[in-house]
């Protein structure tokens, strides 16, 4: 049992330090992913591409092209189709490497995969200004290449947590790790707004230079402090190493160093896996809709100008970050104290997260003129409550298929990446004039998808390691010499 081995403190510890380094890795990864969404606002000269017709009145205020673009004059004369091509190109690359990332991490180690993908993304990010000034097609190809590299990053991190994360600490450790993505969003929005106006080389290029350098520096730290497994980490204490190895082996078997073959048929026919994928797609639909469309929604409904947009749009992501970590602590506490089983903890997290987000988003769409603060409160609450999903499907990947968590999550990321392509296009199609009624349709659609995803997850999810994921010695793991009751207790507490 897990209690048979003395539990070393989580803070400070090597496993928690690894989660902090991964936190900053996710932070810089998301900064490189989302920088274009905001930079393009000051890259494109809307005065030249606008039809000259005044925008729809926002609560009685007519927004002319000059007013809506602040003091920034864009360098490029791109129309909306070109801008959309540049913004969506990332996801066309992103969708192509998810499964590869999990497989490579299992075979060669997550440390190397994360290092190569983030370093490559950082170097290509530094080339964004050169590509943009060459042609919009060169920029789109470059963004697709960045997406391809980043597609392998998160499955590789998940693969590492399958061997680094004791089952009863997974919610906290993965929560800290992936919360970095939200802080990346918080930083990149106001940073981009500031650099657009005051940055060097024309303003917007400095966004890519600064973030790219940050990415390169992070990879140097990562290579020094990380290790594929606790057994190979040079600075971990013997007590912590033994605790992690014993806890992980109790649920997935003893690692023999062999690389197991992936049971694709069993994965693709597993209801528990499809439950994660359904929740994953729904959660990402909501996230991508808000990530790409939130600035436009706030501008259309509230009439915010460029200089204030970044700061306001960051507020929901701060709440999101706090909720992810609080949810992880709460989930692990409920499980360790026996208040809820693993399965019911994951169900509760997904139902509250996704349905709650949908309710708040729909409510925000019905706020009237003069209720700007209320709109922001609703959006913030919706984003915050959605952070509980990190204690749902995200951790559940590690619980149902520890040896194949990177591959299974990578496949889920491939499916959910479609949301990154489809949801912005749907939002643009439904909001040609940016009216409140049009945005209400977008928010109702998002709420419907969130609800369906939460229900499917709750019906078909599992809290136990699936039979096909409990490996034998021939398949790469030797089952630990523990009683069956002990294995189940650790995996499903």
Curated annotation (Swiss-Prot):
Main location: membrane
Family: Belongs to the major facilitator superfamily. Sodium/anion cotransporter family.
Lineage, broadest ranks: Eukaryota, Metazoa, Ecdysozoa, Nematoda, Chromadorea
TM ranges: 10-30, 85-105, 112-132, 144-164, 175-195, 205-225, 272-292, 311-331, 348-368, 375-395, 406-426, 441-461
Gene3D superfamilies registered for this protein in UniProt: MFS general substrate transporter like domains
Species, as recorded: Caenorhabditis elegans
InterPro entries named in the record: MFS, MFS_dom, MFS_Na/Anion_cotransporter, MFS_trans_sf
Subcellular location: Membrane
Gene Ontology cellular-component terms listed: membrane
Molecular-function annotations in GO: symporter activity; transmembrane transporter activity
Coiled-coil annotated residue ranges, if any: none
Record's keyword terms, sorted: Glycoprotein, Ion transport, Membrane, Sodium, Sodium transport, Symport, Transmembrane, Transmembrane helix, Transport
Glycosylation sites: 35, 47, 69, 305, 433
PROSITE patterns assigned to the protein according to its UniProt record, in alphabetical order: MFS
One Pfam family hit: MFS_1
Protein name as annotated: Uncharacterized transporter slc-17.2
Bilayer topology annotation: Multi-pass membrane protein
Gene Ontology terms describing biological process: sodium ion transport
């Amino acid at each position: 049992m897990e209690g048979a081995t003395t539990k070393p403190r989580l803070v400070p510890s090597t496993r928690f330090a690894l989660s902090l380094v991964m936190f900053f890795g996710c932070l810089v990864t998301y900064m490189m992913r989302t920088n274009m969404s905001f930079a393009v606002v000051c890259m494109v000269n809307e005065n030249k591409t606008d039809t000259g017709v005044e925008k729809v009145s926002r609560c009685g205020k007519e927004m002319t092209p000059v007013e809506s673009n602040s003091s920034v004059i864009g360098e490029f004369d791109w129309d909306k189709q070109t801008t959309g091509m540049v913004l969506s190109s990332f996801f066309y690359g992103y969708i192509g490497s998810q499964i590869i990332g999990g497989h490579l991490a299992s075979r060669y180690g997550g440390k190397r995969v994360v290092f190569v993908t983030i370093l490559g993304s950082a170097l290509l990010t530094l080339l964004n200004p050169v590509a943009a000034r060459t042609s919009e097609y060169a920029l789109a190809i470059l963004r697709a290449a960045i997406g391809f590299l980043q597609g392998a990053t998160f499955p590789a991190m998940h693969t590492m947590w399958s061997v680094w994360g004791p089952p009863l600490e997974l919610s906290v450790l993965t929560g800290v790790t992936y919360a970095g993505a939200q802080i990346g969003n918080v930083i990149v929005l106001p940073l981009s707004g500031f650099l657009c106006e005051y940055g060097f080389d024309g303003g917007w290029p400095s966004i890519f230079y600064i973030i790219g350098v940050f990415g390169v520096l992070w990879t140097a730290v990562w290579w020094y402090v990380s290790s594929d497994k606790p057994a190979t980490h040079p600075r971990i204490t013997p007590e912590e190493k033994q605790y992690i190895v014993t806890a992980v082996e109790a649920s997935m078997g003893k690692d023999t160093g062999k690389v197991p073959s992936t049971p694709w048929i069993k994965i693709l026919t597993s209801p528990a896996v499809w439950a994660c994928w359904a929740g994953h797609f729904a959660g990402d639909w909501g996230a991508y809709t808000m990530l790409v469309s939130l600035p436009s929604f706030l501008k259309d409904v509230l009439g915010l100008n460029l200089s204030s947009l970044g700061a306001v749009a960051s507020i929901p992501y701060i709440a999101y970050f706090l909720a992810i970590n609080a949810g992880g602590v709460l989930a692990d506490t409920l499980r360790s104290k026996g208040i809820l089983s693993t399965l019911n903890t994951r169900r509760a997290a997904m139902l509250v997260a996704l349905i709650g987000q949908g309710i708040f988003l729909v409510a925000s769409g019905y706020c009237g003129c003069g209720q700007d603060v209320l709109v922001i409160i609703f959006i913030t609450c919706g984003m915050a409550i959605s952070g509980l999903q990190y204690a749902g499907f995200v951790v559940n990947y590690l619980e149902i298929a520890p040896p194949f968590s990177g591959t299974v999550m990578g496949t889920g990321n491939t499916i959910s990446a479609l949301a990154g392509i489809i949801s912005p296009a749907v939002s643009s199609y439904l909001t040609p004039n940016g009216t409140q009624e049009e945005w209400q349709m977008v928010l109702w659609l998002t709420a419907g998808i969130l609800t369906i995803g939460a229900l499917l997850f709750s019906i078909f999810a599992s809290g136990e390691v699936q039979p096909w994921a409990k490996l034998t010695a021939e398949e790469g793991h030797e089952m630990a010499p523990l009683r069956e009751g002990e294995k189940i207790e650790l995996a499903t507490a």
